[in-house]
């Protein structure tokens, strides 16, 4: 019997077991907190603010979708202009009732921001944490970290920034603990009068799981304190010296006391009288450790037999000492496993130093000083399992360990034989960046944060970048010592609104020769197409640039945009977009700071709006006549568009336009070619649904699930790869199984490689890490071959274990826009996939044709 499930279940508090992703879990947590306060007869409100950025790039989208629901619960969502302004707003929320001027008993706050946003907000974090939180309010700060650097310019670990501001840090393992730790975090924040950090990694925030969302799941204990509850809260007339003393002498001890009473740290494998070896971990690494022990065939019974126990630390700073000491008592060896810099290891060594029978500790290094668990990159469960096995093998008698070490090392050996590099992200069809990032011959441009960062790997003479908001300020330091007289700086309207205008003002003050090329695409494209905070428009940007002293400002626009040109021309010279090169040539001759505002709506956002009839659809289509086309590739060179595909004929390679993917930009017609045909009043013919007959499908043999069934789904961004993972997870949930999915997010993935990791288990509690480990995939669903046969994918597969079904469609990459002869080595890629898992385990067929007939 399938469950009766609706899409609204995730936010209905009466539903216990729900399927949610990490971001949705955070939304539910705010609703749960409001519910719990009402049960305590507290009239509270919620305030959510921050700034988007992977892996917390969709927090604002999820809260915006349920704005009506949260408003009814007095939860206000207000996206910040940038991270530190948002954090300052939350500081203000804790002062709401401080002076007797509020209608509420308190405001519980939630801040979100990516690692770079944590860095730029250090000043306000320190000030607001010292000031404290309100008795019935509290603040959680969700730090979005990207340990693997999959969608960031640096590999971030934010705990040390929070530690430096003396903000306690909770590190959840999985989606369930995102909810649980949020509730615990607000309670801790109220009790101790501190902000509380919440570690949000891709493996938790971008994961989807079945969780227990009961609002009454947790029973919070408020320990007795030497001071009355509320006396550690924010107050009027406080002094810096009193704040510092209170933080060290009262608040941080209260944090540890709360953690002990509420058992935030807990045992995994239970400690017994026989236990001599202990493993400590936290957060995402805890899930990796659980999986690593599975790979060693060590379950709770085996652990008991060999004297192994484990300890999960939830509060990673400051670590609660009493629970740790009690657990560690009698242990001879402790292995500390944590990803990146070793935040816990130093604390644990300090806590256990000088204790009776002090254990030997393995952490970043072994007892001889050799590197054990690295600081850079990420830790893989297979590597963790090998390191654990090698330590255990010297201390216990377990015959199977040596064999497991040999087998696991084979998985790590570099045997992948991919014939091509992985697919890289590319500008969408019709993306304004295809035209706006072009620079004149002899000029050089800088990139920055945004989709235009991808120009770095295209033929755009673009080199170098800065952090968000620093765009162009590096030229202030480079220009006096450079032989180059002028530079071009690309900048998105989102960055301009966030903080970029300050760099432009600095450049004006320094009077350097630079042209800022600001794309106004009417959306924060990289993170999901959100509206700009404050709804700043292109006209306002032009006016602002003139007001701050930019020498010359020119507007360049796509003529399909509906602009009131009379208004714009009162502010700046306005030119069609085909004048972009000569406009840059003109401005590089001007001494001082100049600017171009390039006005063209984001292609992906146009597509979304057109589906909702919110954006006009041109009444024409462009086709290529293959009889005339000579395959010169000038159309691709002019447009940089990935919707121009090769068409192989008996007369050689021609070109065709993928009408399904085309976003109606029409810049391809600028190619010097007579083969283009423009058809007015044209609509793509759709197949009548009645004309398609579904074949009779044979019921498949369902594999037996032993622990988990691990699926890797690959394909090209924008083709429904994420949707497949979501469907599989929901189907498993409907059958009462456990399901977990981890999605690729961040930098615009249209045209780039997408990997979805999906795990299915008999019961939700059987799931640990959702990321599929090296050589641990049971099944591969390949949307196309280039990603499916990449080294990244092949490393997850294993002969005699993995079975694959792969689409044979030839999905060319962005390289084809620059190289007219580029083609994918389909046969070679297929051979490499078959060589990895065996020729009889790969089903390879063209799946795009029958599916495209249905849409």
Walk through the language-model features, giving the residues of each.
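Flexible, low-complexity linker and terminal segments
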Residues: 1-29, 33-34, 172-427, 432, ...
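Thiamine diphosphate
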Residues: 1-175, 201-204, 272-273, 280, ...
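Short acidic, glycine/serine/threonine-rich loops at helix termini
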Residues: 58-64, 89-92, 120-124, 149-157, ...
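Short helix-loop-beta junction
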Residues: 62-70, 292-309, 730-738
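Active-site cofactor/cluster-binding pocket
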Residues: 118, 536-539, 552, 678-713, ...
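Catalytic or ion-translocation cores adjacent to nucleophile or general acid/base/metal-coordination motifs
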Residues: 144, 498-543, 734-745, 751-754
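Conserved thiamine diphosphate
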Residues: 145-195, 201, 226-239, 485, ...
């Amino acid at each position: 019997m399938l469950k009766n499930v609706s899409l609204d279940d995730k936010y209905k508090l009466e539903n216990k077991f729900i399927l949610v992703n990490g971001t949705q879990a955070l939304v539910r947590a705010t609703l749960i907190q409001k519910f719990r306060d009402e049960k305590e007869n507290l009239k509270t409100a919620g305030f959510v603010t921050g700034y988007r950025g992977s892996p917390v790039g969709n927090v604002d989208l999820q809260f915006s979708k349920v704005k009506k629901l949260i408003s009814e619960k007095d939860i206000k969502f207000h996206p910040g202009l940038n991270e530190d302004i948002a954090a300052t707003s939350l500081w203000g929320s804790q002062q709401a009732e401080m002076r007797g001027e509020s209608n509420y008993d308190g405001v519980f706050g939630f801040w979100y921001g990516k690692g770079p946003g944590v860095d730029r907000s250090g000043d306000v974090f320190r000030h607001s944490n010292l000031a404290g939180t309100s008795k019935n309010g509290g603040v959680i700060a969700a730090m979005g970290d990207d340990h693997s650097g999959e969608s960031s310019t640096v590999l971030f670990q934010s705990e040390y920034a929070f530690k430096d501001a003396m903000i306690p840090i909770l590190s959840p393992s999985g989606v369930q603990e995102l909810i649980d730790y949020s509730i615990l975090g607000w309670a801790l924040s109220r009790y101790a009068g501190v902000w509380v950090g919440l570690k949000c990694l891709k493996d938790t925030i971008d994961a989807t799981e079945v969780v227990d969302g009961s609002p009454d799941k947790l029973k919070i204990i408020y320990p007795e304190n030497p001071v009355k509850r509320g006396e550690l809260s924010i107050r009027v007339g406080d002094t810096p010296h009193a704040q510092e003393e209170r933080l060290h002498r009262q608040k941080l001890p209260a944090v540890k006391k709360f953690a002990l009473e509420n058992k935030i740290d807990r045992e995994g494998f239970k400690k017994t009288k026989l236990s001599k070896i202990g493993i400590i971990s936290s957060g995402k690494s805890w899930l990796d450790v659980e999986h690593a022990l599975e790979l060693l065939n060590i379950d709770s019974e085996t652990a008991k037999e060999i004297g192994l126990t484990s300890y999960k630390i939830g509060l990673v700073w400051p670590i609660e000492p009493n629970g740790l000491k009690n657990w560690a008592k009698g242990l001879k060896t402790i292995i500390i496993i944590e990803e990146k810099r070793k935040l816990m290891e130093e604390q644990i060594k300090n806590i256990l130093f000088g204790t009776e029978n002090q254990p030997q500790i393995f952490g970043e290094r072994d007892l001889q000083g050799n590197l054990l668990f690295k600081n850079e990159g990420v830790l893989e469960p297979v590597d963790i399992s090998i390191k654990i096995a090698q330590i255990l093998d010297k201390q216990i008698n377990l015959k199977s360990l040596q064999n497991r070490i040999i087998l696991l090392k084979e998985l790590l050996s570099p045997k992948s034989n991919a014939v091509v590099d992985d697919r890289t992200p590319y500008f969408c069809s019709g993306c304004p960046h295809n035209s706006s990032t072009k620079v004149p011959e002899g000029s050089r441009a800088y990139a920055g944060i945004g989709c235009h960062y991808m120009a770095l790997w295209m033929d755009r003479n673009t080199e170098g970048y800065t952090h968000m908001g620093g765009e162009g300020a590096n030229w202030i330091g480079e220009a006096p010592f450079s032989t180059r007289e002028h530079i071009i700086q690309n900048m998105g309207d989102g960055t301009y609104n966030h903080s970029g205008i300050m760099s432009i003002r600095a450049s004006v003050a320094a009077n350097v020769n630079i042209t800022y090329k600001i794309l106004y695409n009417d959306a924060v494209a990289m993170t999901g197409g959100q509206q700009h905070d404050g709804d700043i428009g292109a006209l306002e940007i032009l006016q602002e640039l003139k007001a701050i002293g930019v020498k010359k400002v020119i507007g360049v626009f796509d003529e399909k945009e509906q602009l009131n040109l009379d208004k714009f021309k009162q502010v700046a010279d306005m030119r069609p977009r085909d004048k972009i090169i000569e406009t840059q040539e003109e401005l590089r001759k001007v001494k001082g700071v100049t600017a171009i505002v390039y006005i063209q709506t984001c292609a992906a956002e146009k597509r979304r709006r057109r589906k909702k009839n919110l954006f006009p659809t041109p009444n024409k289509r462009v086709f290529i006549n293959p009889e005339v086309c000579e395959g010169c590739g000038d159309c691709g060179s002019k447009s940089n568009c990935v919707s121009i595909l090769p068409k192989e004929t008996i007369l050689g390679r021609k070109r065709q336009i993928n009408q399904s993917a085309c976003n109606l930009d029409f810049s391809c017609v600028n190619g010097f070619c007579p083969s283009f045909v423009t058809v007015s009043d044209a609509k793509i013919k759709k197949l009548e649904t009645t004309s398609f007959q579904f074949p009779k499908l044979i019921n498949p043999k369902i594999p037996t699930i032993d622990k988990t069934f691990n699926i890797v789904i690959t394909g090209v961004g924008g083709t429904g790869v994420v949707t497949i993972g979501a469907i599989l997870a929901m189907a498993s949930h409907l059958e009462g199984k456990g399901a977990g999915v981890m999605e690729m997010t961040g930098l615009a993935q249209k045209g780039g490689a997408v990997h979805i990791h999906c795990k299915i288990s008999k019961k939700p509690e059987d799931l640990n890490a959702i990321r599929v480990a090296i050589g641990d995939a049971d099944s591969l669903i390949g949307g196309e071959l280039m990603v499916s046969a990449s080294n990244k994918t092949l490393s997850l597969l294993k002969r005699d274990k993995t079975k694959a079904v792969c689409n044979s469609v030839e999905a060319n990459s962005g390289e084809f826009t620059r190289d007219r002869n580029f083609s994918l080595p389909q046969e070679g890629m297929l051979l490499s996939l078959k060589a990895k898992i065996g020729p009889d385990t790969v089903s390879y067929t063209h799946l795009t044709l029958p599916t495209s007939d249905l849409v």
